[in-house]
């Protein structure tokens, strides 16, 4: 469906947040939503991020289409693809409930320069971490 980024991350793994997160939003034919959250922490430069930043919108709310042949989201995924799974809500209005979340346990590296560019254009565009409210969080592979 779409993907977007938040700075800082809107998720915590073992009470630790990440510098950024990429949300890969999926929707099935019944309209049900699932989001894969890829945590991003300072490290090596990420080649996919370089491509995406070239097409990054400069104003909040703008939508940009990147040529499909340039976009291989596998380049964003960490080697270890184990994840936590829970039912939650979208993190942007209207914050709809009933969303299946899969938060990857291992962060993907992003260069400090890549992080700095995003954070200058979109400072603190993250929703505060929400309480679990009794939601079951399970570890999956």
Regions picked out by a protein language model, each given a short descriptive name:
Residues 1-19, 23-141:
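Extracellular or lumenal secretory-pathway regions
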């Amino acid at each position: 469906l779409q993907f977007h980024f938040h700075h800082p991350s809107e998720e915590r793994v073992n009470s630790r947040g990440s510098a950024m997160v990429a949300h890969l939003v999926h929707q099935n034919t019944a309209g049900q939503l699932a989001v894969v959250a890829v945590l991003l922490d300072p490290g090596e430069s990420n080649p996919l991020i370089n491509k995406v930043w070239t097409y990054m919108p400069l104003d909040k709310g703008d939508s940009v289409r990147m040529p499909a042949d340039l976009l291989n989201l596998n380049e964003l995924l960490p080697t270890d693809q184990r994840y936590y799974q829970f039912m939650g809500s979208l993190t942007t209005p209207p914050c709809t409930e009933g969303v299946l979340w899969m938060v990857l346990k291992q962060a993907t590296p992003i260069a400090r320069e890549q992080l700095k560019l995003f954070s200058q254009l979109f400072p603190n565009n993250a929703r505060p971490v929400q309480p679990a409210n009794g939601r079951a969080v399970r570890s999956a592979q």
